[in-house]
């Protein structure tokens, strides 16, 4: 979505396909870092973005045993926003979609699922998709697959994946947040255990890290 916004802002005709009817996927990336916020400033979106509901994290703290340790402090960064912003991914994507829609070269098609690639002289030259209105074909000089770890576009293009593996995984859950809960402690580390907490306003988004 961000790439589509930036390209359309530069005058490039862009078509973005989203297979779902909305962006409501829980437990996705909700962190918007100071470097990204700086880009938002550079393209004129920062003030509008900061008016949207979000949480700000100026530092990252860990609870290790009985000790609280600050492991990152963003107050010294040479950026306008010296914090990580937390905003549900669906809200951020909707925000970018609204910003992009102001450009006549930005086209977002919801409920459009990629089913194939168009080929020309051995190169990808567009996509084929299914929509409620019927099949859709889009000719394109550039096709970008931003459809996740199980990318349909990547599979259709027969691109190989180098799996580096990971020694751990995370169990995600949500826990109600009480008014008297402590401040933005982002993680707790014990003997062989790691718990990550993300403040989502009225609840905690929690990741319990487990070995694979």
Residue ranges and their predicted role:
Residues 124-125, 130-136, 142-212:
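Conserved FAD-binding catalytic core of PHBH/FMO-like flavoproteins
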Residues 110-124:
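A conserved short coil-to-beta-strand element within the FAD-binding core of flavoproteins
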Residues 33-99, 118-121:
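Active-site-adjacent segment of FAD-dependent monooxygenases/related oxidoreductases
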Residues 6-28:
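Glycine-rich FAD pyrophosphate-binding loop
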Residues 62, 114-117, 144, 196-197:
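A structural signal for short hydrophobic beta-strand segments in well-ordered beta-sheet cores
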Residues 2-4, 18, 40, 96, ...:
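Generic structural signal for small/hydrophobic residues in well-ordered secondary structure
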Residues 3, 8-10, 102-104:
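Conserved dinucleotide-binding and phosphotransfer motif residues
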């Amino acid at each position: 979505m961000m790439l589509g916004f930036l390209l359309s802002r530069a005058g490039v005709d862009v078509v973005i396909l989203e297979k779902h009817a909305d962006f409501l996927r829980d437990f996705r990336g909700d962190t918007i870092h100071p470097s990204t916020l700086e880009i938002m400033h550079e393209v004129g979106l920062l003030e509008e973005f900061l008016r949207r509901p979000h949480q700000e994290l100026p530092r990252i703290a860990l609870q290790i045993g009985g000790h609280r340790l600050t492991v990152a402090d963003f107050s010294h960064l040479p950026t306008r926003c010296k914090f990580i912003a937390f905003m549900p991914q669906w809200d951020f994507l909707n925000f970018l979609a609204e910003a992009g829609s102001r450009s006549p070269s930005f086209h977002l098609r919801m409920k459009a699922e990629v089913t194939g690639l168009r080929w020309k002289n051995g190169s990808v030259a567009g996509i084929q998709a299914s929509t409620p209105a019927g099949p859709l074909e889009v000719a394109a000089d550039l096709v970008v697959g931003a459809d996740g770890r199980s990318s349909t576009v990547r599979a259709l293009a027969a691109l190989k994946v180098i799996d580096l593996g990971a020694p751990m995984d995370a169990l995600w859950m949500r826990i109600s947040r009480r008014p008297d809960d402590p401040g933005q402690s982002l993680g707790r580390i014990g003997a062989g255990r790691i718990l990550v907490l993300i403040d989502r306003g009225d609840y905690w988004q929690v990741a319990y890290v487990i070995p694979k």
